[in-house]
Amino acid sequence: MIDDDGYRPNVGIVICNRQGQVLWARRYGQHSWQFPQGGINPGESPEQAMYRELFEEVGLSRKDVKILASTRNWLRYKLPKRLVRWDTKPVCIGQKQRWFLLQLTSNDKDINVQQSKTPEFDGWRWVSYWYPVRQVVSFKRDVYRRVMKEFAPVVMPLQEQVSMSRPSYGYRRKRY
């Protein structure tokens, strides 16, 4: 399902843990990493697509996460010309995405990137919040920056709660 402008409707998923870190997944058989994402099927809402992709790509279900936020608008990126399939009709020149910020409410052990018969990912790890903006492939970088900027007011308080719950081991200078 490609819109009149050549963009494929898609959802992107940012999963954070209680420490405010985000799940970063390695694409199957590649050295590139990204957030889980996937197309919206005809008749499917963005939220329904998000839950389907969540299960297909990382093996998590609705009971394993809590929706914290979603982007207000569709965010778009164009594919590099070398990745556009010019022989298909209609031609898809990029993705338009609705993004969801989820908090993992279950355990790390519930994450399973091998859930699908044709897995998208072969590994994953927790990374600091802003890390993906610098590391994602260049043509997705602007969308990632916009997503993370929009979600930051929700995630930053989580990080502050964690740092405030840790004991502070300050030191006193010895006076002579």
From Swiss-Prot:
GO terms for cellular component: cytoplasm. Its EC number is 3.6.1.-. Keywords: Hydrolase. It holds the Pfam family NUDIX. Belongs to the Nudix hydrolase family. RppH subfamily. This is RNA pyrophosphohydrolase. A motif (Nudix box) lies at residues 38-59. The gene is rppH. One of its GO terms (molecular function) is mRNA 5'-diphosphatase activity. It is an enzyme of class 3 (hydrolase). Residues 6-149 form the Nudix hydrolase domain. It comes from the Bacteria. Accelerates the degradation of transcripts by removing pyrophosphate from the 5'-end of triphosphorylated RNA, leading to a more labile monophosphorylated state that can stimulate subsequent ribonuclease cleavage. Coiled coil: none annotated. GO terms for biological process: mRNA catabolic process. The keyword Hydrolase applies. Its cofactor is a divalent metal cation.
